[in-house]
Structures are given as C-alpha cells and as structure tokens.
Amino acid sequence: MSKKIIIIAGPNGAGKTTFARSFLPEEAQCPRFINADLIAAGLAPFAPETAALKAGRLMLEEIEDCLRKGESFAFETTLSGHGYLTRIRQWREQGYHVSLFFLCLPDAETAIARVAERVRQGGHNIPEGVIRRRFAAGLRNLERAYKFAVDAWAKYDSVGESPALLEWGENQ
C-alpha cells in the first residue's frame, strides 16, 4: 500500500472531526488521525483551550514521527495559514500521495452557531473573531493555493446530515 497523507480541512464547526471519525477508517483505510483538539482535550479535559499551544506542538511532533517512519496519517486544519504548503511539496517529494478534503459551510454565522452548539454540548470554544478570520482565510487559501498543491482534492457541503460532494480535482 502506498504512503498517504489525508488533510481534513474546513472552518471551525464544519464537522471535520466527525467526518474524519467515519471517513478515515471506513473509506480511506487510514486509522491514524492526528488532531490538535483531541490532544488538547486529553491534556486538559475541563479546559482544552488552555492546552492549545502545547497540543499544536505535539501534533506537529506526531506528524514528524509518522514521516520518519514512512507511515500514512491524516490530520485536520482550518487552512487559515500557508504553513502547510511547503510541507505538502516535501511530502509529495518523499513519495506520499496527499489528498485534501475541505468541508464547507455557507457563511461564518453558520460556523459560529455550530461552535456555540458544540460548547453547549461540552465541546471546546473558539472566539467569534477567530472563527470569522479563519472562515474567510481557509476558503481563500483553498481556492488560491492548497487545491493546486495536493495530489487530489474534494470540496464538500457539510450543512446537511452527511457531507455532499460539490467539486473535486486531481493534479499531476
């Protein structure tokens, strides 16, 4: 089996972790899911936001460990920055097939409402201003850069019961 890296992306509240939990083991045969939010919840279960920086560092260390071992893995991100672009190029040069699955929401207000619902159910909060910034940046970065950097990408509408494919593409 070839080495693969799967990036589950989208705005806060888009359902990335929920999607990953069913998609990765069942559809993608990728049981290794590296998630900073889940790491933070393990470090500080009653206040995961206090462990966010440490969790982010641990996530990057775990990614590096997988790369050293030549293992396949998946991780999630909002794509609000350009930090993964250089890494994606390097991963592809190392023989990894890199796929990106982006879960869309119609607007930042929907993302804010979903995060508020997650908090009501005991999940972690994200400040409204951060959600708005990441929402705009993530979609812009997908369209301008990330979908051209990976081997394959798919964009889903994640408003309904299950994500609906909107568009997809492949690169050489």
What are these regions, as identified by a protein language model?
Residues 144-172:
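NTP-dependent small-molecule kinase module
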Residues 13:
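Walker A (P-loop) phosphate-binding loop of P-loop NTPases
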